[in-house]
Amino acid sequence: XNTAEI
């Protein structure tokens, strides 16, 4: 999957 930092 993908990881995202918001």
Curated annotation (Swiss-Prot):
Note: On the 2D-gel the determined pI of this unknown protein is: 5.0, its MW is: 75.9 kDa.
Name under which the protein is recorded: Unknown protein CP 6 from 2D-PAGE
Lineage: Bacteria, Bacillati, Bacillota, Clostridia, Eubacteriales
